[in-house]
Amino acid sequence: MSKWKDVKKVVLAYSGGLDTSIILKWLQTELGAEVVTFTADLGQGEELEPARKKAEMLGIKEIFIEDVREEFVRDFVFPMFRANAVYEGVYLLGTSIARPLISKHLIEIARKTGADAIAHGATGKGNDQVRFELSAYALNPDIKIIAPWRDWSFKSRTHLLEFAEQHQIPVAKDKKGEAPFSVDANLLHSSSEGKVLEDPAVEAPEYVHMRTISPETAPDKATIIKIGFEKGDAVSINGERLSPATLLAKLNDYGRDNGIGRLDLVENRFVGMKSRGVYETPGGTILLAAHRAIESITLDRGAAHLKDELMPRYAELIYYGFWFSPEREMLQAAIDHSQRHVEGEVTLKLYKGNVMVIGRESDKSLYSDKLVTFEDDQGAYDQKDAAGFIKLNALRLRTLAARDRK
């Protein structure tokens, strides 16, 4: 293609799946470019050696497969959870938060290998194209970015399957003998889109769910766990200190076994359309409940309420792909400052899809039983003081009422 005629070497974000395997072959045949592959181990729960073998089969000489699980949770997931970030009230941003990390490594590998372009498999209809490219440009303003879904003649996955068959590219099959749902997975979540899920009125079949058992079949006995926090980050489960990735993986196990973290969502994409997806975020759902609980006793009311006001904007920045933007970094600095005293332990009950906070404690707690007791508080609080407080706060309301009754 003439627009890419100067591109000699491309780093491809490669999963080994249908789209990126076809993109790899397309880059070779249509652009005549040398391709370098990068496969990130984000904790997606699948063996990555098949991706290496597939790349080798397609003639790739430089293959990068990197375990980025700890970096992912430590530098991306945990900072996001300090903000209690959810998009449109429910989505825990599992796909969104992984994209800037992938872009970061694509840019680094391009620099190491002397590549003049990077490529990704995101479609021209979705959010991921924006997330990958905004992140890449923020890190290297001169990088060339190839997005084949916006350039090639294929208009559907049916056409992709035909191309794959022509070039003898193996394609995985699901239980029905068809090409699988469009799936994204990492240590934080998994998502499924496409096929019957494109009709928002139709319930997702059970086999779509990869990370959790159904709440109906979850154990009849509740699971009790304790999560320890330091400076807003989870550091332990049941008293055992764990690395960030190990801790999230363990929470995923607890969530999976108790049917926690399923979400059937129609969301507003950045590009303007609505889309339906089925998400599973077992460990993240538990972590969010625990983090909000420890904040409830360690954050001042004003700071907590301001943080809640800022959260939707922060979540939107991540969803839209602005992780490396100055405004996200500014908000992160404020959020991180708020977490200095967010430490302690939260006890949770996990039962049939539910996460229930049943206890929270901290040496930095602002909760005072002397102030809130219904018994004798030994002079800790003078209830007579409330009269003046109410009178001053009612002043403007009484003034308005006096005017309006005339």
UniProtKB/Swiss-Prot annotation:
Catalytic reaction list: L-citrulline + L-aspartate + ATP = 2-(N(omega)-L-arginino)succinate + AMP + diphosphate + H(+)
Record-level GO BP terms: argininosuccinate metabolic process; L-arginine biosynthetic process; urea cycle
SUPFAM superfamilies xref list: Adenine nucleotide alpha hydrolases-like (SSF52402), Argininosuccinate synthetase, C-terminal domain (SSF69864)
Gene Ontology molecular function, alphabetical: argininosuccinate synthase activity; ATP binding
Keywords: Amino-acid biosynthesis, Arginine biosynthesis, ATP-binding, Cytoplasm, Ligase, Nucleotide-binding
InterPro entries registered for this protein in UniProt: Arginosuc_syn_C (IPR048268), Arginosuc_syn_N (IPR048267), Arginosuc_synth (IPR001518), Arginosuc_synth_CS (IPR018223), Arginosuc_synth_type_1_subfam (IPR023434), AS_cat/multimer_dom_body (IPR024074), Rossmann-like_a/b/a_fold (IPR014729)
E.C. code: 6.3.4.5
Localization in the cell: Cytoplasm
Major site of localization recorded for this protein: cytoplasm
Gene Ontology terms: cellular component: cytoplasm
Amino-acid positions noted as binding ATP in the UniProt annotation, renumbered to this chain: 13-21, 40, 121
Positions contributing to L-citrulline binding: 91, 96, 127, 131, 182, 191, 267, 279
Pathway recorded for this protein: Amino-acid biosynthesis; L-arginine biosynthesis; L-arginine from L-ornithine and carbamoyl phosphate: step 2/3
Record's subunit section: Homotetramer.
PANTHER family per UniProt: ARGININOSUCCINATE SYNTHASE
Family, as annotated: Belongs to the argininosuccinate synthase family. Type 1 subfamily.
Protein name, UniProt field: Argininosuccinate synthase
Organism: Brucella anthropi (strain ATCC 49188 / DSM 6882 / CCUG 24695 / JCM 21032 / LMG 3331 / NBRC 15819 / NCTC 12168 / Alc 37)
